[in-house]
Amino acid sequence: MSIGLIKLIYKRKGSKNNLSNFRPITMLNTDLKILAKILANKMKNVLPKIIVTNQAYGVRGRDIADIKSGIRDIISYLNETQKDGYVVNLDFEKAFDRVEHVFLFAILERFGFGKNVNEWIKILYNNVMTRVVCNGFLTEPFKITRSIRQGCPLSAQLYTLVAEPLCLMIKKDKSIQGIKIEEGKEEKKIFQYADDTTLILKDLESMKEVMRKVERYGKSTGARINEEKTVYMKFGRVPNLVGIFNFEEVKETKILGVTLGKDEKGARERMFEKLVGEMERRLIFWRGRFLSLKGKILVVNALMLSKMWYILTVSAIPRWVEVRIKRCVLDFVWEKKPPRVAYNTLIGQTDKGGMGLSDVELKKKSMRIKVVKKYIDDQEKGEWKDTMKYFLDKCGEVKLGDNVLWMKMKTWMFEKIPDFYKEVLKACFFFSLKG
């Protein structure tokens, strides 16, 4: 039961001759996966209570969008206030594969998991053997003394527990200064989703102290920073890190699949230009197929527009993108001929006689209303809520806070808030008219 098979999956970047550009996925025995899934379901119930940081990976009720939104808003805040600071995107080398089992078992005990749970997890991870599938052949079995198996149903919960100590060390150290949005509120210092770690630091001394913490954490867990892939953006008058750390300074970077940069509008434009180009090329491929109208709509919804929804949850969308996508979709559906069905019928619900085609503008507005719903829900603990309140207070410089969500506002009142929150307010007004 303890023997797994490792299959190497190419990451689709870098040379295939470099082994580090492959991701090891472990295929496990079905009995083991059933047992691991039972334990994972039990752990899901307690993780929200013991993971006190903003870590969202494998924690029930938390969303990756909260992490992306928090980082996006901090960048907007630093640009708007012109305050000093660093936004550092740490790259942990083979994060899951380097976790020491001794540390993993110690963490489980430290978090108070019972003896039975700990023993079952030790059965799953102690004295386990693995073989590698390579070119259709199997290597000889070898013993695994470290790593959290990617492919194990428990991997998300276990790695979240392993990552928590680093986040706690950074958050609790008062010598490490983050960015404070409002007096009386906690400083924003670190955002985590699995091993994707983004630091928000005020000065160089804080950066040095964080790296000391990371080094100490690595000695215990086996974690190691890949300095060549770690990048940072600096804001205000903070010094460059060249000669201090082997990190690359960038104007923009991709964080959790979304491009964020100092030039927020420019980074967004380039991200959508690339995305829309990929969508158009994908539809060219499908044009040669003999598809029915329903088949074409399925292709558009499932293979084209679905790629945009992930980004749209946290990024404002330029108007030209909406226009270009709509034109591209209609050209594909009607084969560049005059439409035979009204657009409102195309996007209408199928149970009401429509065709169910997704509409980018309506989807955007519904996503923005979801943001409002999470914002006014006291059970939601996303750190972006502090920055959203800050930007809502900027509307008209009258500090009306949440009240602006229910008001009809003049265009000039939007000028000092990020484009994303402009879309939020416009969506509120749109649905208030519908109501």
Give short role names for the model-derived ranges.
Residues 1-165, 169, 329:
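Conserved pre-catalytic core of RNA-dependent polymerases
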Residues 194, 245-317, 334-338, 366-383:
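Basic, alpha-helical interaction scaffolds
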Residues 173-192:
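Active-site nucleotide-donor binding segment shared across nucleotidyl transfer reactions
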Residues 325, 338-435:
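Extended C-terminal regions of large enzymes
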Residues 94-111, 147, 190-219, 236, ...:
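Catalytic palm subdomain of template-directed nucleic-acid polymerases
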Residues 322-333:
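Short amphipathic alpha-helical coiled-coil/interface segments
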Residues 136-138, 224-253, 271:
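Short, conserved micro-motifs composed of acidic
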Residues 11-12, 30-31, 41-43, 90-92, ...:
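Residues immediately flanking
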